[in-house]
């Protein structure tokens, strides 16, 4: 491989390594955001309800608890995905290269073995080594970005669930089912609306799970 191509590969490796550092920084921000949303929701959502928890109607309390629990669980999944994105990529390359610290340990039993390989390496094979390194770094980078994308989607779903945990109880409260003269009609209307919201929420989760399965393939 000629000198120009080797220099191009070196620049590409530096660029990929820079993206890896940026991905880790982005993951830290996502983790902070997800943790902040979870803490805020756990401590303050009940304060936004029309009544205290012990005075809420059964329907309001159940809807609040349901969406709150769903939101917390999905938020935790988002945190788990973010932690996976932060985790160091320690998979060795399919083809050994002398630059990756993972490959150095994986393919060499001692420093002497590694030293001998360095001595035998000539410039003509340097490009192959850099290509192997850049490919392995790119695989790790893509894996981090995929986990970040999934974490963001899960975080959005959890925030939507937290929002519904406030909106639905207020909805029940405003209609005041227990006092209205058209109780059966309102109950039926609320049941239909709640069912639609639940179906939309469930479909969102199913689509996301299908997306994960397709992504893994």
UniProtKB/Swiss-Prot annotation:
Q: Which GO terms describe its molecular function?
A: nucleotide binding
Q: Which domain of life is it from?
A: Bacteria
Residue ranges spanning the membrane: these are 29-49, 60-80, 152-172, 187-207
Write out the annotated subcellular location: Cell inner membrane
Q: How does it sit in the membrane?
A: Multi-pass membrane protein
Query: Does Transmembrane appear among the keywords?
Result: yes
Any single biological process term in GO: defense response to virus
Keyword annotations from UniProtKB, A to Z:
Antiviral defense, Cell inner membrane, Cell membrane, Membrane, Nucleotide-binding, Transmembrane, Transmembrane helix
Q: What is its main location?
A: membrane
Gene Ontology cellular-component terms for this entry are: plasma membrane
Q: What does this protein do?
A: Pycsar (pyrimidine cyclase system for antiphage resistance) provides immunity against bacteriophage. The pyrimidine cyclase (PycC) synthesizes cyclic nucleotides in response to infection; these serve as specific second messenger signals. The signals activate the adjacent effector, leading to bacterial cell death and abortive phage infection. A clade E Pycsar system. The effector component of a two-gene Pycsar system. Expression of this and adjacent cytidylate cyclase Ec303145PycC (AC P0DV26) confers resistance to bacteriophage P1, T5, lambda-vir and phi27. Probably only responds to cCMP (produced by its cognate NTP cyclase), acts by impairing membrane integrity.
Quote the protein name from its UniProt record.
Pycsar effector protein Ec303145PycTM
What organism does the UniProt record list as the source? Answer: Escherichia coli
Q: What is the lineage of its organism?
A: Bacteria, Pseudomonadati, Pseudomonadota, Gammaproteobacteria, Enterobacterales
């Amino acid at each position: 491989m000629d000198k120009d191509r080797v220099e191009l590969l070196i620049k590409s490796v530096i660029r990929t390594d820079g993206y890896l550092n940026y991905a880790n920084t982005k993951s830290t921000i996502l983790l902070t955001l997800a943790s902040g949303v979870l803490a805020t929701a756990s401590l303050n959502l009940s304060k936004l309800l029309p009544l205290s928890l012990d005075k809420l109607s059964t329907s309001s309390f159940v809807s609040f608890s349901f969406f709150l629990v769903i939101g917390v669980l999905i938020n935790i999944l988002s945190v788990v995905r973010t932690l996976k994105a932060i985790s160091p990529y320690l998979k060795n390359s399919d083809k050994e290269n002398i630059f990756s610290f993972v490959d150095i340990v994986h393919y060499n039993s001692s420093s002497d073995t590694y030293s001998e390989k360095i001595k035998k390496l000539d410039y003509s094979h340097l490009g192959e080594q850099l290509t192997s390194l850049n490919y392995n770094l790119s695989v790790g980078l893509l894996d981090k970005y995929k986990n970040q994308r999934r974490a963001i989607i899960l975080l959005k779903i959890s925030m939507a669930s937290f929002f519904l945990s406030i909106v639905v109880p207020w909805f029940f409260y405003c209609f005041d089912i227990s006092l209205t003269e058209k109780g059966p009609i309102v109950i039926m209307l609320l049941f239909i609306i709640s069912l639609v919201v639940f179906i939309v929420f469930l479909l969102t989760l199913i689509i996301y799970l299908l997306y994960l399965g397709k992504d893994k393939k």
